[in-house]
Amino acid sequence: MKKVLFETHHLYYWPNFLPVVEELLKRENYVINVSMPKRSSSFQENILNNVCSVTGILFITANTEEERINKIIKEDYDIIIVGNVGQLNQIASSDALVVMVYHGIGLKQSYYNDIDERVDIRSVESVARFNELKDYGHGNLALTGFTKLDRLVTLANESINETRTKLQIDPSKKTVLYAPSFYPTSIDRVCPFLPELGQDHNVIIKLHGFSWEQKKYHYQNILCSELSKENENIHLLANEDFDIIPYYLVADILISDISSTIFEFLPRDKPIIQAQCYNLKLKHRIFKRRFWGKMDLERQDSVDFTYQISEPEDLLGMVYYAIDNMDEMSSNRIEASEFYLYETDGKASTRLVDAIENH
């Protein structure tokens, strides 16, 4: 039996890992452990620990980060799977096979920068990105597709119905999923228009984990919590509800900004509105080049499958238009899904585990 550690740097990495965990468990010759770096707040850790308890997976923790790292080193794992570089070089032995399933596929340059020579296999979500990384000199690539999206195919209809029931979604209304990034974000400028949107639609708000967990973005969950309390058709998903996949499956339309969600929603072949109305930090308003240097502008310029708005006042009209013309951009979305996501057949995790076993 090979020992596998999923080093889950943040809670929102777990949906990327879950299909890989399920595939490893099916093959029956792996012992799986999960861990998360120690932080001042144990909230994320407690949520993930509970998730692991339900599935019978051992969660590795300790009183301090140093103790946790020492525990991991003593376990001497055969395989370590990460979502970013993080503590990789401290926890991986020289004999361990290190696999990266990167946590996001959005519009930030970190996709190309957050890498380390210690990674033996990097799961890549598309042919285009595979060739791009290869041109940069990376030779540790496995073309798999995006593992997170496997459950768009494998999640049972029963689970989808449970999601609708849990939120008490009005079946007579279309459902809008609003899934903004934490920064830069459209939240400040879009939220004032959500109550009016909620008059004729179910509105589900799925915030980024940092909107709950980092103090400087905490105002975002406060703002959205107030909206949810005051409007019966606006449903804010709690921090514990960190898995967005079930909500992709009940949504008729997605609103986002620079989040990976604009790519993740493509297999649903439903309208996507990209709200390009951000409130930038003062330093980025003054030194704009510093901000745009963190963005993948070439990737943004290639996006031709979303309805794009630069002013929040245009949101309501665009939602109504998109819902009345659901198929208008269908061919763009289908082509984009093939370009940005390789195969969306529910087997990305199978291809990754095959690559691990063949390494």
What does each of the following model-derived ranges do?
Residues 64-67, 217-263:
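Donor nucleotide-activated moiety binding/catalytic core segment of transferases
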Residues 80-82, 95-100, 239-287:
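A donor-sugar binding/catalytic signature common to diverse glycosyltransferases
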Residues 20-23, 189-205:
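Short hydrophobic signal-anchor/transmembrane segments that target glycosyltransferases
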Residues 118-188, 212-213, 331-335:
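A nucleotide-sugar donor-handling region in carbohydrate enzymes
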Residues 5-154:
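Active-site and donor-binding regions of nucleotide-sugar-utilizing enzymes
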Residues 35-53, 57, 200-240:
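Catalytic donor nucleotide-activated moiety binding site of glycosyltransferases and closely related
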